[in-house]
Amino acid sequence: MDALQALVLGALQGITEWLPVSSEGQTMLAMISWLGMRPTDALSCSIFLHTGTMLAVLVRFRSRLLGMLNTESKLMRTVIVATLFTGITGVPLYMLFRDRFTGGEQATLLIGSLLIATGLMLRLRSSSTKDMEEISTKDMVLLGLAQGFSILPGVSRSGTTLTVLLMRGVKQDDALMVSFIISVPAVLGAIALDCLAGSPLSIRSLPGAVMLASSFITGYATMDVLMRFSRNVSFSWFCITMGMITLALTALPEVQ
């Protein structure tokens, strides 16, 4: 892998990480078809790419994360509970499917359809939405269980968690913020699992640094665009738009 390839892969990760499609699936497909990597190597490299977007979250939400140090913070409780239940589904699935790469198109199509259905239901009825402080323990548990399934290549972590939060009535800007922040322990856990499983991947220092920088910059920019977008559209139209983006991006490989 040279520096230019690393730059492209990092940008692909940064752009797709926060969209309701699988960044892991997209980067793995690129590495397998473009670079000729083995699926296990591509999975390890895809997990490594998440480090850049994780750093983007830490920088973008540094004030909120510092506020989490208060043990009574609702955000802190949400992160802890969601992370625990992510492990319940994520660890067994990782161990079972690490060597079996699947595209996950059906899961992505389901996520897109659910987002559109949620938006349409909200258009038909008046619905109050919850802010961060109103998220319940049940919301946290469902969020964590859903995030665990995103360890599978092709299943979108952001799409899955965003769908759960929106269907539970959480405001779109809070839903995005929570989805971004709970990715941090999820990424750290995935990296630890990959290392414990004996990751076969060895990345040279220059391509590795380029991938991290590229995924960080594009990930930060994409996050900022989505947060601005969420504040300027209605709750229902936000769901419908994100669902349509999901379905459109899922169809792209078929067109190509």
Curated annotation (Swiss-Prot):
The Enzyme Commission number assigned here is: 3.6.1.27
| Class of enzymatic activity (EC top level) | hydrolase
Catalytic activity reported = di-trans,octa-cis-undecaprenyl diphosphate + H2O = di-trans,octa-cis-undecaprenyl phosphate + phosphate + H(+)
Q: Please indicate if the UniProt record lists Zinc as a keyword.
A: no
Q: Does the keyword Cell membrane apply?
A: yes
| One Pfam family in the UniProt entry | BacA
Parts of the chain that traverse the membrane = 39-59, 77-97, 101-121, 135-155, 176-196, 206-226, 233-253
Topology in the lipid bilayer is annotated as:
Multi-pass membrane protein
Q: GO CC terms for this protein?
A: plasma membrane
Keywords of the record, alphabetical order, are:
Cell membrane, Hydrolase, Membrane, Transmembrane, Transmembrane helix
* Similarity comment: Belongs to the UppP family.
Against PANTHER family, the record matches this protein to:
UNDECAPRENYL-DIPHOSPHATASE (PTHR30622:SF2)
This protein is called: Undecaprenyl-diphosphatase
The root-end lineage is: Archaea, Methanobacteriati, Methanobacteriota, Stenosarchaea group, Methanomicrobia
